[in-house]
């Protein structure tokens, strides 16, 4: 399975910093990924709403940082443009080890803005220091503020990190032992399960519908003709 965020240089840099004790005890994991990406009805419907199709990766990375299982959660979502399913969701809660989390994900971020942008970050807060990351899909910036070290690292974003996945898989074959850096099928199943659980929890609360289907039609039409945009589905001849 390719839980690709686990293979990214920025998340591994932050996790190594945490392991060094630079931020004290891990206390809070905050993850946000909002883009004007895949719109409802464009495809991927078999993968479910945005928070499952895309959001499960952020569910996984929060659990990966915490090193523990989800214990409690409360989710709020919005049915943007009066679409049948929520396309934005925020969930907060706790892990069994006491670490607190919040995850925000949605492809609703300025879909019809003249110049599109996004908001994607991870914010890791400890009892003594912090570590955080932002990216623009081209370059990632990691800022580390520990008790003895302060760093600001800028490197290429890295995309889906397929090269790292292949390298780890090849090493596992050559040694006959699965690399500990490779996720198990169980990890993917848990990420999927809890993405669905958070969606189900949101449906149990007030689920407002804001906007109109006509706006969604305009979004789809714009994305159909865009040459450069977020998460465009390429048509092959």
Predicted features along the sequence, with ranges:
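Residue-level signal for the nucleotide or nucleotide-sugar donor/cofactor binding architecture
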Residues: 9, 53, 160, 183-186
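A contiguous active-site-proximal alpha/beta segment in oxidoreductase catalytic domains
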Residues: 1-40
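Short arginine-rich
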Residues: 194-205
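Short catalytic-loop micro-motif centered on adjacent basic/acidic residues
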Residues: 1-3, 74, 182
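Glycine- and charged-residue-rich phosphate/anionic-cofactor binding loop of Rossmann-like
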Residues: 150-154, 172-190
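Short glycine-enriched, charge-decorated loop/helix-capping segments at active-site entrances
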Residues: 45-49
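A short, charged, Gly/Pro-tolerant segment at domain boundaries
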Residues: 36, 187-190, 210-224
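Contiguous beta-strand/loop segments that form the cofactor/metal-binding neighborhood of enzyme cores
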Residues: 53, 59-139, 156, 163-178, ...
